[in-house]
Amino acid sequence: LVSGNATEQAWIDGIKAASDQMRNKTIDRPKLVRLMALYFFITYAALTITFYAAFLVDGYHLPKTFSGVLISLFFLAIMAPGLILDRIIGIFKGYTNVAAIAMIGAGLFCFGIFRDRGMLVVGASLAGFGYGLMQPLIYDKTAIIAPPRAATLALSFVMAVNYLAIMLCPFLIDTFTRLTALHGDRVPFLLNGMLTAGLALLAFRRRDDFTLGLDASYYKR
């Protein structure tokens, strides 16, 4: 009976999601732009690790191969949330995005503050896990705001900003350091850690927002 009720509820949730999608005659552009902006920022912030970990490791006089280990752990952590996504959402519920953004920020601060190898491993894992947690949620929301015939187009726009962030990340950080005369291997991590902390605070205050929050349909069964 319990299994039957769970199956029925999952079916009802699927019907609701489909009806939300069918109500859209065109792509909801304001929501799409906000999702693109959010995806751009978290990609830009998280990729600080892939671009600048090697410089930090070298500055800390750690083995050069350790930066490769950190980057590998970062991408491994991105994959991990997808394996237990429902459980994670069940734990954090409407605060899922807040928690994910906070993880990215905490990971960056681990790089910017600590010199210990263990904390750098924790930082790479936290940042990757938080980023990997937000990715599927952004993709799912993107599909919802477009009619079925335009869902692929909407997703292509969101995916495009992912690659745009990859391309612009080092240029944006280098431009900031030149303009502010702030230098050092820790600066990129501290800068983006502070920006991410600000976004986490905004997500907490706007946790009922479509972009920064998470609808109850994701975790109510």
Residue ranges: model-predicted function:
Residues 173-196:
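A membrane-interface helix-boundary motif in multi-pass transporters
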Residues 31-72:
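Extracytoplasmic gate region of multi-pass secondary transporters
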Residues 145-181:
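A late C-terminal transmembrane helix in Major Facilitator Superfamily
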Residues 80-93, 177-178:
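Helix-to-loop junctions at the C-terminal end of transmembrane segments
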Residues 94-138:
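C-terminal transmembrane helical hairpin of 12-TM major facilitator-type secondary transporters
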Residues 188-221:
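Multi-pass alpha-helical transporter architecture, strongest
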Residues 69-78, 162:
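Transmembrane alpha-helical segments of major facilitator superfamily
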Residues 1-23, 211-220:
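Flexible cytoplasmic inter-helical loops of multi-pass small-molecule transporters
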